[in-house]
Amino acid sequence: MVIVPKKNGKWRVCIDYRELNKATLKDHFPLPFIDQVLDTLAGKKYFSFLDGFSGYNQIQAASEDQDKTRFTCPWGTFAYRVLPFGLCNAPATFQRAVLGIFSDLIHDCVEVYMDDFTVYGDSFEEALENLEKVLIRCKETNLSLSHEKCL
């Protein structure tokens, strides 16, 4: 276990999951191609950029998998109840979850790439309406945003 500083001055706990990752059946759920996302956004006039707060940590780990995340440190032995950083399938799991949350809004008013959400509209009013839809969905699904990184 190592603790490393984040850009915002807070700390990130990093666990070495290399052995677990070797034994894990890989989830090949695709991440979106950034050029396809950019094509969708081309020509739009108004944008809001949202950032999921501690993205992976908002996804519950399956109860049967929590014990696999166990680690020991000077203060005891712990296991994650949420998806920790460092698991090989974390990006695919998170992307699948977020796409599920916004499935009816994607390509209509929001594009999602991991924990970065781009809300858009052709007019200021439409962009505000779309932002409201996305924020309501975040509230309904308890998806927290990092207010420091939202624009």
Q: What is each PLM-predicted segment?
A:
Residues 1-151:
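Retroelement reverse transcriptase polymerase core
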